[in-house]
């Protein structure tokens, strides 16, 4: 109970200024229809992260496309600022994968955004059947490849 109260007090402004922030604010999917997780500090520092904000909800194809569009807009807006960064081994600042396992479809997208000072930022989403999870991350993780290793 105390942890729930603490998590509820965490600020939600880390992803402010991004188009996807509309989702985290409950303007696209009502907050009561989402499972939201906010983690900050020591609990995730061993993963080289300082901020983790995720929302999970049921999403049809149209909603997935709408959210993907917002995330891509954020990525494109930041891609100019990424020229100083080292791309992954394939030369990309984003990654995607589509899998089918046990009759379930799984689609994942990961995007590197321009850093805020020395803090690196990432936007990721995963769709498993009709459930979508969107995650905003901040920390010292240096690349998408390193981030993928953390989430293995």
Where are these regions (language model features)?
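Mid-chain, structured segments of secreted extracytoplasmic proteins
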Residues: 56-102
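A short, solvent-exposed beta-edge/loop patch
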Residues: 110-142
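Acidic, glycine-rich flexible loop segments
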Residues: 94-120
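Early exported N-terminus immediately downstream of N-terminal targeting peptides
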Residues: 18-74
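Bacterial Sec-dependent N-terminal signal peptides
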Residues: 1-20
